[in-house]
Amino acid sequence: MSYYYGNYYGGLGYGLGGFGGFGGLGYGYGSSYGLGGYGGYGYFSPSFYGGYLSSGFY
């Protein structure tokens, strides 16, 4: 659970990287780094479900 929140809320702190996914288009890297580094890393994060997909990918 900590991984999900770490990405979802972590991306939020980096610039809405995981909040919804729209922000992930530009701040996808922030979302992945908020989780650990492999939360999509610009591949899954910039999708429409940035937070969910990057968490699932990790």
Curated annotation (Swiss-Prot):
One Pfam family in the UniProt entry: KRTAP
Any one cellular-component term (Gene Ontology): intermediate filament
InterPro entries: KRTAP_type8/19/20/21/22
Keywords: Keratin, Repeat
Induction line: Expression in skin and hair follicle is regulated by HOXC13 and by GATA3.
Coiled coil regions in record: none
Signal peptide (UniProt feature, chain positions): none
Lineage: superkingdom: Eukaryota
Region named 12 X 2 AA repeats of G-[YCGS]: 6-52
Oligomer status and interactors: Interacts with hair keratins.
Functional summary from the UniProt entry: In the hair cortex, hair keratin intermediate filaments are embedded in an interfilamentous matrix, consisting of hair keratin-associated proteins (KRTAP), which are essential for the formation of a rigid and resistant hair shaft through their extensive disulfide bond cross-linking with abundant cysteine residues of hair keratins. The matrix proteins include the high-sulfur and high-glycine-tyrosine keratins.
Family named by the database record: Belongs to the KRTAP type 19 family.
The protein's name in its UniProt record: Keratin-associated protein 19-9b
